[in-house]
Amino acid sequence: MNQNTQPTNNLKDKKITYNFNKLQKRLRRNVGNAIANFNMIEAGDKVMVCLSGGKDSYTLLDILLNLKLSAPINFDIVAVNLDQKQPGFPEHILPEYLASIGVEYKIVQENTYGIVKEKIPEGKTTCSLCSRLRRGILYRTATELGATKIALGHHRDDMLETLFLNMFYNGKLKSMPPKLISDDAKHIVIRPLAYCKEKDIEKYAEAKQFPIIPCNLCGSQPNLQRQVVKEMLQNWDRQYPGRIETMFSALQNVTPSHLCDTQLFNFKAVKHGEMINGIEGDIAFDKMDIPMTLNIQEEDEKQAYTQNGTIQFKAV
């Protein structure tokens, strides 16, 4: 019995290890490509990774630390958690975890929970105020630490959800930028997980057994608009495999001449007999071959580095 069971267990363990390595390589490649494409991290940067205790920020920190080991440039990482003084928040978990992996960290204690509860009526969503409070505190902390970049754990699915939220409720064609500058131009915010699927992050966090801390202030509130949009996208993904990838590709392939924003494209300049830069004429949906499904292939990770000190991971 034991002799027969041992080979089976070995094969199972090898398969688990293979799948994890494959997943980790994919996340490394996606994060590396995002860093390179948007010039997120440069030589000498001090990257402040905002750690909430959720799967996304744990994965972000872990992958960045992993990439740092083989990066051709020097940059520093400091993890920051904002303890918002939520009732029952396990204050010991993050310090213990961060100390165990040997990363520089800072725990910022601010009673934003009390402010939110005081200002927002019971039953109303707290996300907007909570987000503004957190943002201000994180900007201040970045200045105190001398951080040149602030890294957030938003991923591809978050960006698509924001796109639809803005279309449905704000009348804007606007998503989450992978890189932005604060209103006072003092802080640069980056989202290195911009190319990463939430499914991959969930699997990675489970495999790494991160000590996840659930959010009881905003993310668990019922009937949030974001949750409704998330479920809509998940349903689409089940019914039409590849649709999420196609929609995210659309965020990277914008044709202003085929939209209606006069600030993005000068429609008044369109004249008989003249072709202007940025115009695609009558090339529209009916002239294109639209694939019904995507052929998504996983590629081996290969590293390539530029001369300006920016990390690049080239997928071939």
From Swiss-Prot:
Belongs to the TtcA family. Its EC number is 2.8.1.-. Binds 1 [4Fe-4S] cluster per subunit. The cluster is chelated by three Cys residues, the fourth Fe has a free coordination site that may bind a sulfur atom transferred from the persulfide of IscS. This is tRNA-cytidine(32) 2-sulfurtransferase. Homodimer. Gene3D superfamilies: HUPs. GO terms for biological process: tRNA thio-modification. The lineage of its organism: Bacteria, Pseudomonadati, Pseudomonadota, Gammaproteobacteria, Pasteurellales. GO terms for molecular function: 4 iron, 4 sulfur cluster binding; ATP binding; magnesium ion binding; sulfurtransferase activity; tRNA binding. Its main location: cytoplasm. A motif (PP-loop motif) lies at residues 52-57. [4Fe-4S] cluster binds at C127, C130, C218. Catalyzes the ATP-dependent 2-thiolation of cytidine in position 32 of tRNA, to form 2-thiocytidine (s(2)C32). The sulfur atoms are provided by the cysteine/cysteine desulfurase (IscS) system. It catalyses: cytidine(32) in tRNA + S-sulfanyl-L-cysteinyl-[cysteine desulfurase] + AH2 + ATP = 2-thiocytidine(32) in tRNA + L-cysteinyl-[cysteine desulfurase] + A + AMP + diphosphate + H(+). It is found in: Cytoplasm. The thiolation reaction likely consists of two steps: a first activation step by ATP to form an adenylated intermediate of the target base of tRNA, and a second nucleophilic substitution step of the sulfur (S) atom supplied by the hydrosulfide attached to the Fe-S cluster. It is an enzyme of class 2 (transferase). GO terms for cellular component: cytoplasm. Keywords: 4Fe-4S, ATP-binding, Cytoplasm, Iron, Iron-sulfur, Magnesium, Metal-binding, Nucleotide-binding, RNA-binding, Transferase, tRNA processing, tRNA-binding. Its cofactor is Mg(2+); [4Fe-4S] cluster. Pathway: tRNA modification. It comes from Haemophilus ducreyi (strain 35000HP / ATCC 700724).
